[in-house]
Amino acid sequence: MGDTVVEPAPLKPTSEPTSGPPGNNGGSLLSVITEGVGELSVIDPEVAQKACQDVLEKVKLLHGGVAVSSRGAPLELVNGDGVDSEIRCLDDPPAQIREEEDEMGASVASGTAKGARRRRQNNSAKQSWLLRLFESKLFDISMAISYLYNSKEPGVQAYIGNRLFCFRNEDVDFYLPQLLNMYIHMDEDVGDAIKPYIVYRCRQSINFSLQCALLLGAYSSDMHISTQRHSRGTKLRKLILSDELKPAHRKRELPSLSPAPDTGLSPSKRTHQRSKSDATASISLSSNLKRTASNPKVENEDEELSSSTESIDNSFSSPVRLAPEREFIKSLMAIGKRLATLPTKEQKTQRLISELSLLNHKLPARVWLPTAGFDHHVVRVPHTQAVVLNSKDKAPYLIYVEVLECENFDTTSVPARIPENRIRSTRSVENLPECGITHEQRAGSFSTVPNYDNDDEAWSVDDIGELQVELPEVHTNSCDNISQFSVDSITSQESKEPVFIAAGDIRRRLSEQLAHTPTAFKRDPEDPSAVALKEPWQEKVRRIREGSPYGHLPNWRLLSVIVKCGDDLRQELLAFQVLKQLQSIWEQERVPLWIKPYKILVISADSGMIEPVVNAVSIHQVKKQSQLSLLDYFLQEHGSYTTEAFLSAQRNFVQSCAGYCLVCYLLQVKDRHNGNILLDAEGHIIHIDFGFILSSSPRNLGFETSAFKLTTEFVDVMGGLDGDMFNYYKMLMLQGLIAARKHMDKVVQIVEIMQQGSQLPCFHGSSTIRNLKERFHMSMTEEQLQLLVEQMVDGSMRSITTKLYDGFQYLTNGIM
């Protein structure tokens, strides 16, 4: 949020090297480089060092930095601690490459003068090729990450670290887990190359700062505790959590908090004065954190926050800018841990609604939902809409979050709180003149609402402690009130003049609506999420907006998030990256496969947040609620075989099934029961829960031995074994595999970099990466690949282990 793209310097024409044949313009040399992208071993280390040293000399002249060291690495390339230093893209061509006259004495002594001249010529050519690759349009972020990981030369690493400033923020953000994992677990030169970019971006974006702090903590957790405490990752995390990286404009605003005369204060100034006077109480935030800490890791985090907060002047400084958001996240996690201690789903649901009702007392505040893609402030959580999701041992839950979109999170004021009892007046504005209230009176009534939350102190830990209190009856009255307000808003919008509609038109419209309206699920106390997930998203947004005191505001938005405690989402994040990369590859190669990667926020090694898939329910819920086969459910939802709606849903099913079958094969995704496969309103299937991938399986049983899950019910929806859509499915599988193996390196490097220093179960065993590469079948012809696809499809359909695992899940967890 609030990311600012670093504008690269305009590209200058690059002088072509003269080492290629006449008239070739060096094209053959460039083709040689592009054929071996990532194979850094073919480049002489001394040549790479010399080439990059020349570029870095130019950087030194541009930035006025410290001279380049003898190893080729800059001692101070980009001053990450400087706020106003200009960051420029290093696309300018370097100076003419110097001959290595001073360094060649030993080489000449060991060989003939002719051999030395030939070696110098070859080195110059290799130097030119490498630099031309780095400056070409082919050099994208994926290639930069590959060279940063594979290179052993500090000069190359430092050059690429500076090239990170040239790429779009969103492109680099995709590889943030890889960058931070390299920073933590690889040598110092890699860390020195990465840090300036991380520090610069943290100054620009509070959301980027939060992401870095969370990932650094999660990926450092696999280290030994004594090593972890003094590691570079821990030090960088402490720097981010302190106030050192606060944007300059926020630091300059602090003197404005000095006391002002009481006379003639405007309402806004009076509010500001109040927040300053309460700053002393709010600054003690860190000392109260330990009341809600539930494990030693959280306590350690709190100690770090406390130490950084004590140095702040209580009179003039607000708390660390990330402190309110961290408290908001910790309170959501604490709710999940408390829910897990309750025995029944109904008790968990009641407790969840009560806890969220108390949480609303501290909103609006300077907090946001990190899974969203735009700047906003959280203003309200409609607590009666929250549901507990299916889980045997834990208590993941789904909440909906009302936010107000803003241009810049850091500079926009926190919205004023609107009490719940003002819903009627805000939603029935057009009726107010009839009640004798003028427009001026109405405007005046809203302007007198004090903005008590327009500061960083809006989130107080003292009130979070109150969440320990159970209020089982809170949700009942709130639900009734919201229902009443919804009715009032509907009646208030009724037209004043009668409208006459023919009875035949009414019957026709009702019949059309019934034909296209999806069926609703019945409320099940053991599965309360089914009804909530089945409701169409747009209908849910309309309903919640009508019941919200903020719903009348034009920048009101509704978000949703799944909160998970006790689960390590680092594997989920890895799977998300692979799915996102495959999705990009198939789009680039124009293969109409469909998959739905959903965002993952890793909070710690055992907690996180997940972006829900809207308008989708699990196949288990479909079968349990409808008591129909998958094909019959399709017919019920989308119409008969020949309708356009059914044919469109069938095509969507085939394209998504083929896409996820390839994903499951390449990543070896396990635990594929019907509770982990969703079906959306358009007919797509979406696989969720990637907790068992690559080298791991549930309880290490190795139950699922087939390449992917393809049941007879899936084939029936496709039209049977002899249907055209089933042949289309196999053709898509072949096209998708051919396209994926063309870009194998982009997929493999995502996984390979994350294996560094990791103790995740998916990396157990020494052959994880080798087996992943083998599943791309680089040596096979297309005819052999076609035969392979036929064999995998046939084997998956006939797999006895798939049937056994589905039966096992039904007996142990009741999953149909």
From Swiss-Prot:
Activation loop as annotated region, ranges: 687-711
Residue positions, PTM N-acetylglycine = 2
Which residue intervals make up region (G-loop)?
Answer: 541-547
Gene from which this protein is expressed: PI4KB
Activity regulation here? Inhibited by wortmannin. Increased kinase activity upon interaction with NCS1/FREQ.
Subunit annotation: Interacts with ARF1 and ARF3 in the Golgi complex, but not with ARF4, ARF5 or ARF6. Interacts with NCS1/FREQ in a calcium-independent manner. Interacts with CALN1/CABP8 and CALN2/CABP7; in a calcium-dependent manner; this interaction competes with NCS1/FREQ binding. Interacts with ACBD3. Interacts with ARMH3, YWHAB, YWHAE, YWHAG, YWHAH, YWHAQ, YWHAZ and SFN. Interacts with GGA2 (via VHS domain); the interaction is important for PI4KB location at the Golgi apparatus membrane. Interacts with ATG9A.
What cofactor is this protein dependent on?
Answer: Mg(2+); Mn(2+)
Phosphothreonine-modified residues are 263, 438, 517, 519
The record describes its membrane topology as:
Peripheral membrane protein
Q: Where is the PIK helical domain?
A: 52-242
Q: InterPro entries under this entry? A: Kinase-like_dom_sf, PI3/4_kinase_cat_dom, PI3/4_kinase_cat_sf, PI3/4_kinase_CS, PI3K_accessory_dom, PI4KB-PIK1_PIK, PI_Kinase
What is this protein's function?
Answer: Phosphorylates phosphatidylinositol (PI) in the first committed step in the production of the second messenger inositol-1,4,5,-trisphosphate (PIP). May regulate Golgi disintegration/reorganization during mitosis, possibly via its phosphorylation. Involved in Golgi-to-plasma membrane trafficking.
Report the source organism: Callithrix jacchus
User: What EC class is this?
Assistant: transferase
Where it mainly occurs, coarsely classed, is membrane
What is the protein's name according to its record?
Answer: Phosphatidylinositol 4-kinase beta
Question: What's a single GO BP term from this record?
Answer: phosphatidylinositol-mediated signaling
Q: Region Catalytic loop: what ranges?
A: 668-676
Is the Transferase keyword given for this protein? yes
- State the residue spans of region: Disordered: 1-30, 99-120, 248-318
Stretches assigned to the PI3K/PI4K catalytic domain = 535-801
Which reaction(s) does the protein catalyse, per the Swiss-Prot or TrEMBL entry? a 1,2-diacyl-sn-glycero-3-phospho-(1D-myo-inositol) + ATP = a 1,2-diacyl-sn-glycero-3-phospho-(1D-myo-inositol 4-phosphate) + ADP + H(+)
Source species, domain of life: Eukaryota
This protein's GO CC annotations: Golgi membrane; mitochondrial outer membrane; rough endoplasmic reticulum membrane
Q: According to its UniProt record, which protein family does this protein belong to?
A: Belongs to the PI3/PI4-kinase family. Type III PI4K subfamily.
Residues modified as Phosphoserine: 258, 266, 275, 277, 284, 294, 428, 511
- Give the matching Pfam families: PI3_PI4_kinase, PI4KB-PIK1_PIK
